[in-house]
């Protein structure tokens, strides 16, 4: 009669015994796209419904160069400008 208790066999939970040994692969790698694609069209420059004449700016013509981007897009909110990468 054997008085010793049976020894428990400890096995690793991560390794399967008897299966083929294959190298583990990491997560798939994704490439960054160079151009961004939006679900909606980006906004157009200029204020909607803006007339040709500006009070106090007579005689300059309608060819006004916009220096600041928020002057061309002042009809939009900041989060809309940031969504399309304007600011």
Swiss-Prot record:
It comes from the Eukaryota. One of its GO terms (molecular function) is 3',5'-cyclic-GMP phosphodiesterase activity. It holds the Pfam family PDE6_gamma. The modification N-acetylmethionine is found at residue 1. Keywords: Acetylation, cGMP, Hydrolase, Sensory transduction, Vision. It catalyses: 3',5'-cyclic GMP + H2O = GMP + H(+). Its EC number is 3.1.4.35. GO terms for biological process: positive regulation of epidermal growth factor receptor signaling pathway; positive regulation of G protein-coupled receptor signaling pathway; positive regulation of MAPK cascade; visual perception. GO terms for cellular component: photoreceptor disc membrane; photoreceptor outer segment membrane. Residues 26-44 have a biased composition (Basic residues). Residues 1-12 have a biased composition (Basic and acidic residues). Coiled coil: none annotated. InterPro entries: PDE6_gamma, PDE6_gamma_sf. Disulfide bonds: none annotated. Belongs to the rod/cone cGMP-PDE gamma subunit family. Oligomer composed of two catalytic chains (alpha and beta), an inhibitory chain (gamma) and the delta chain. PANTHER family: RETINAL CONE RHODOPSIN-SENSITIVE CGMP 3',5'-CYCLIC PHOSPHODIESTERASE GAMMA-SUBUNIT-RELATED, RETINAL ROD RHODOPSIN-SENSITIVE CGMP 3',5'-CYCLIC PHOSPHODIESTERASE SUBUNIT GAMMA. This is Retinal rod rhodopsin-sensitive cGMP 3',5'-cyclic phosphodiesterase subunit gamma. It comes from Bos taurus (Bovine). The lineage of its organism: Eukaryota, Metazoa, Chordata, Craniata, Vertebrata.
């Amino acid at each position: 009669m054997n008085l010793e208790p049976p020894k428990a066999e400890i096995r690793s939970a991560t390794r399967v015994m008897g299966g083929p040994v294959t190298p583990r692969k990491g997560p798939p790698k994704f490439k960054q796209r160079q151009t961004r694609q939006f679900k909606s069209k980006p906004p157009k420059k200029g204020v909607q419904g803006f007339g040709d004449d500006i009070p106090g700016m007579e005689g300059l013509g309608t060819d006004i160069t916009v220096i600041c981007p928020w002057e061309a897009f002042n009809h939009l909110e900041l989060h809309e400008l940031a969504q399309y990468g304007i600011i």
